Amino acid sequence: MEIPLKEQESSLNSSSGHSSSTSEGVANTQGLDNRGEEILSQLYRPLKACSNTCYCKKCSYHCQLCFLKKGLGICYERSRKRSSKRAKTTTSSAPNESLSARTGDSQPTKKQKKEVETTRATDLGPGRSNTSTSRFAN
């Protein structure tokens, strides 16, 4: 049983000689891990405002915000609500008009019908004579 213990001790001694080279490798991987963590922390931190307005290739890729905005065309800003012209006119004229006028009651009354008929018969327009009645008279 002593033989396995001696083998373990000898293996430990031999591994201690290689420990300096492995510790350098571990340090290198830790350095890479630190750089990877730094890159990830930069990726997840909030984007800072950038005032660069140029859209050239160099400026589009110089920071993450510019890449998203200029390179990909993604913009997460709030869009302004545009009020339509119809909404403005209906709100301003609504208190002044009656309910039937707002609902679109388009049927004219009898007085309006008579006025329309008389204006059609009398007003023939410029340069026209009353030829329509002479055709039907024959």
Curated annotation (Swiss-Prot):
One of its GO terms (biological process) is positive regulation of viral transcription. Residues 67-77 are annotated as: Core. The keyword rRNA processing does not apply. GO terms for cellular component: host cell nucleolus. Its main location: host cell. InterPro entries: IV_Tat (IPR001831), Tat_dom_sf (IPR036963). Pfam families: Tat (PF00539). This is Protein Tat. It comes from Human immunodeficiency virus type 2 subtype B (isolate EHO). The gene is tat.
